Amino acid sequence: MARQKGLIKLHGTMGDITFYRSKDGYMAREKGGVSAERIKNDPRFQRTRENGAEFGRAGKAGKLLRSSIQSLLRTAADNRMVGRLTKEFVKVIQMDATNPRGLRNVIDGEAELLEGFEFNIQGKLSTSLSAPFMPTIDRATGDMIVNIDPFIPAESLIAPSGSTHYKIVTASMDINFESSAYASETNETPVQPIDTELTEPLQLSNNLNPDSTNPLFLVLGISFYQEVNGTFYEMKNGAHNALQIVKVSGTP
């Protein structure tokens, strides 16, 4: 690339030269790159094709998982979540020790690597909720449960300034990444005050198909509200709501 000189600074493309502005100033570069046809057929780009196939598979898997909890993600996801989730699915696929490179997939990979994934970096569950909890997945019965120990909300919740209430939610997903089908179920508490009263032990349970052979996922989240004249408003339109994959059971 070359730096533009002179009084007149150009933008756009002229012939094979593209003019643009970057943090380094006004620049110019010549068109280049490899054609799609060459990447598709040239043996020297075999690795590129393999990487592309697996990346596409990861993107499709991430989209399917997001679809299974779309209603929760509307208020509990940051603007880079899609890319971050795809990156994690690439890691899952790369752990497939059965299939050759380019044909590796989620089913034969390590879906458990997704445990701990935060859908909202701006409101991580790991910092929003300090109360001990235990997630369990029973594949035989289809029961997916989160048990949360008693806690004092004012002490155990890191809530956005101005929050007066909170709600805890769980979601369970049974996902077939080969057929692009899924089953999901959610459960949630009523909206509760952020006060100094010790809560009762809390259990949120969902039930999906027993003896499933698909990867199973259990998600836990929390959202924050401000009460104004009896109406609850989500804080900053849910910008600080947390949602995390807390348990994964890959294929049996």
Language-model features: where?
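Short, low-complexity, polar/charged sequence segments that are solvent-exposed and flexible
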Residues: 38, 46-47, 81-83, 165-169, ...
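C-terminal interaction-tip segments
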Residues: 228-252
